[in-house]
């Protein structure tokens, strides 16, 4: 096994490609924050998942939160997203507001949202997927593997506007992702059983293609070539179908962490988001000092991810 304690302090000093003038000319990243949370909807009396909530629920949520709430692949799930936040306190206030509004709207239908990455006893084969063209295509392509995705997560976007810098920091921060996962776990139960894992969500998620830790890339051009290959061969329609633990966002100039469970405690989720933002800030400062975090073998990081 791999000792995180023995590895985490290891750094190697190495020179970046390009001159110091080129590095200095690169704009510093904004490191803005955006947080997305997925909630499962349960019946307040039975505590079971809501199999087929009325369309009026989403209508009311849209009235309350507008574009900050979206439906998900399964009808028993909704997703909220904060606005772009300049600092962590602003993101915290946004999540408090969003959680409160979802609770209030759901309560009017006899439902409640739960911030847990799996439901403790509901069965996946009883759930229905949302009827949208994108979701219908997923259901056809992924079949039963998609229907088992009765799981929720927390995604954290950090603003890194320069393309090559975004890839460079992604390569390095991969090492820390298992640590963030360990801090977030909220999914030990599945269909009425204690699975013996603190994050069974990740085991379910890994059944899909294009998941797990991403490869390293020499720069944005290499990453973009991969995306274009996948799109050109009809495997994916766009980069949003890359479901890695971390990825350059397909919609924003952000680096999106996707590995964590959703935290039942809002304060825990905010602490993890702040830690992720701080790690990227640290790695950028190291770069400015002509240093970088060591790139560890994928096998070792994968073992830490499992542990």
Where on the chain are the PLM-derived regions?
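Long, hydrophobic, amphipathic alpha-helical segments used as structural scaffolds
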Residues: 109-117, 181-184, 188, 284-291
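C-terminal accessory/tail domains of diverse enzymes
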Residues: 21-109, 138, 144-147, 205-307
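Short, positively charged and aromatic/hydrophobic N-terminal segments
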Residues: 5-11, 16, 22
């Amino acid at each position: 096994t791999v000792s995180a304690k023995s590895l985490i302090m290891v750094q190697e000093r190495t020179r970046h490609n390009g001159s110091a003038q080129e590095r200095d000319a690169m704009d510093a990243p904004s490191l803005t924050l955006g947080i997305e949370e997925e909630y499962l909807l349960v019946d307040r009396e039975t505590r079971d998942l809501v199999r087929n909530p009325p369309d009026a629920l989403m209508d009311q949520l849209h009235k309350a939160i507008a574009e900050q709430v979206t439906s998900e692949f399964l009808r028993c799930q909704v997703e909220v997203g904060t606005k772009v936040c300049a600092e962590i306190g602003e993101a915290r206030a946004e999540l408090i507001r969003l959680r409160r509004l979802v609770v209030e709207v759901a309560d009017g239908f006899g439902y409640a949202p739960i911030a847990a990455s799996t439901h403790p006893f509901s069965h996946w084969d009883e759930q229905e997927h949302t009827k949208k063209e994108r979701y219908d295509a997923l259901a056809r392509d992924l079949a039963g593997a998609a229907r088992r995705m009765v799981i929720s997560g927390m995604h954290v976007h950090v603003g890194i506007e320069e393309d090559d810098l975004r890839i460079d920091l992604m390569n390095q921060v991969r090492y820390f992702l298992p640590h963030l996962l360990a801090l977030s776990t909220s999914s030990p139960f599945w269909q009425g059983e204690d699975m013996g894992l603190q994050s069974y969500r990740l085991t379910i998620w890994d059944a899909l293609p294009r998941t797990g830790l991403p490869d390293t890339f020499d720069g944005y051009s290499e990453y973009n070539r991969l995306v274009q290959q996948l799109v050109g061969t009809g495997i994916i329609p766009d980069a949003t179908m890359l479901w890695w633990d971390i990825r350059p966002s397909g919609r924003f100039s952000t680096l999106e962490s996707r590995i964590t469970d959703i935290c039942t405690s809002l304060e825990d989720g905010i602490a993890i988001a702040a830690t992720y933002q701080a790690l990227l800030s640290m790695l950028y400062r190291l770069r400015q000092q002509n240093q970088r975090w060591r790139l560890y073998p994928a096998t070792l990081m994968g073992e830490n991810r499992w542990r």
